[in-house]
Design a protein with these regions (language model features):
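Conserved PLP-binding catalytic core of the aspartate aminotransferase-like
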Residues: 265, 269, 278-318, 324
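Conserved PLP-dependent catalytic core of the aminotransferase class-I/II
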Residues: 63-67, 241, 245-284
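Conserved PLP-anchoring active-site segment centered on the Schiff-base-forming lysine
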Residues: 77-78, 95-116, 124-126, 130-131, ...
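PLP-dependent enzyme catalytic core of the Aspartate aminotransferase-like
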Residues: 2-3, 316-317, 327-363
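Active-site phosphate-binding strand-loop segment of PLP-dependent enzymes
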Residues: 133-187, 192
Length: 363
């Protein structure tokens, strides 16, 4: 039995999986229509030539641009395509006219590779205070800090790579703008999972996670009135993937984007309730967190290699999850966790099977 009322429709739109896929935060399963759209464009490229096929698909590409921009509260002319979320961030930091030794404030859940990009450019990185033990930004403390100091920009992962905590991005943007500070949002894990219209100056993300588009497609939306206009469209591109992303977004729209958000939050809650206290594994989010990602810290005495071994054990019996190591959130933790991230086609039996295996690994 599916957890979500959308589960059967989501499942029927895809090839039958050979595994229990609980890894949408890494890469969701694309639908048959997405795969067909990608394949059809590749055939057009072979038949007519790549650039001719791209030109003849201009209306499809324009719709994709409009639809993605709308999901993040931007206009089509503010959106550029790149190869991935990280490629989008690199392009932004390359073309933005930042001062030498710029200061950036980040949330505790900041993605490690993003921090590497800041470090390589000599930025001074400061962590915004957290309101709880989960790494959620304390917006009251942030408001107070902004009265006395303003960074060059704030960068926040709407949802991180290491846990399912949803940052209060809209409030962060409101406070930052009141202080004249621009905000950049990494929406890689958020797009398709939660509302990403926050008023941020810059939003970037990827196709392959909760939107269930193809790999190899990312985007960057930069407000026309932000720090500096950024012209960073990637011209040598996976055009078929962009068309596939457009189909994936249209499918989300057909289901109802807000309804998907609600259903995924309910799936996350059910997942946490089912796995709470299983085999000495510790749940790392509040049960009611409004995301579909659940992370489990290992039993006492386990090290990072043990969590990797647990992931490999699950994979060997056909259950796909991620070992989220500490490099994903180095400001927050030194601990590796198991990350469980089901999509709409989650069945109760999937979690029962996972719980049984986890119980056998614990105490």
């Amino acid at each position: 039995m599916y957890i979500s009322e959308l589960g059967e429709l989501w499942h029927r739109a895809r090839v039958e999986p050979s595994i229990v896929h609980l890894d949408s935060a890494a890469a969701s399963r694309s639908s048959n229509k997405v795969i067909e759209a990608v394949t059809a464009h590749l055939w057009r490229e072979s038949e007519r030539g790549g650039y001719v096929a791209q030109e003849q698909s201009s209306e499809l590409l324009a719709r994709t641009r409009r639809d993605i921009a709308a999901l993040v509260g931007h206009t089509a002319d503010e959106l550029a395509f790149r190869e991935s979320a990280l490629a989008a961030l690199r392009a932004l930091l390359t073309y933005w006219n930042m001062p030498v030794s710029a200061t950036v404030w980040v949330a505790p859940n900041e993605y490690g590779p993003n921090l590497d990009q800041f470090e390589r450019r000599g930025y001074a990185v400061h962590t915004m205070p957290s309101t709880d033990g989960y790494g959620r930004v304390d917006t009251d403390a942030l408001q107070n800090m902004l009265q006395f100091e303003q960074p060059d920009f704030i960068h926040v992962c709407h949802i991180g790579s290491h846990s399912g905590i949803v940052q209060p991005v809209a409030k962060i943007v409101e406070l930052a703008h009141d202080a004249g500070v621009p905000v950049v949002v990494d929406a890689a894990q958020a797009l398709g999972q939660v509302n990403c219209v926050t008023g941020a100056d810059v939003v970037y993300g990827t196709s392959r996670k909760w939107v269930a588009g193809p790999r190899g497609v990312g985007f960057l939306a930069t407000r026309s009135d932000s720090l500096r206009p950024v012209e960073i469209e990637s011209s040598e591109a996976f055009i078929a993937g962009r068309i596939g992303l457009g189909v994936a977004v249209q499918e989300l729209q057909s289901f109802g984007v807000e309804k998907i958000h609600r259903e995924l939050a309910a799936i996350g809650k059910y997942t946490r309730e089912r796995l709470f206290g299983v085999g000495s594994w510790e749940l790392m989010e509040p049960v009611g967190e409004q995301s579909a990602i659940a992370t489990l810290a290992p039993p006492p005495g386990w090290g990072p290699s043990d969590v990797v071994a647990a992931r490999d054990r699950l994979r060997s019996i056909g259950i796909l999850v991620t070992c989220a190591e500490s490099w994903r959130a180095p400001l927050y933790t030194e601990q590796s966790v198991l990350r469980i991230s089901p999509h709409l086609d989650l069945r109760r039996g999937h979690l029962d099977q996972l719980a049984t295996e986890l119980r056998g690994m614990g105490y």
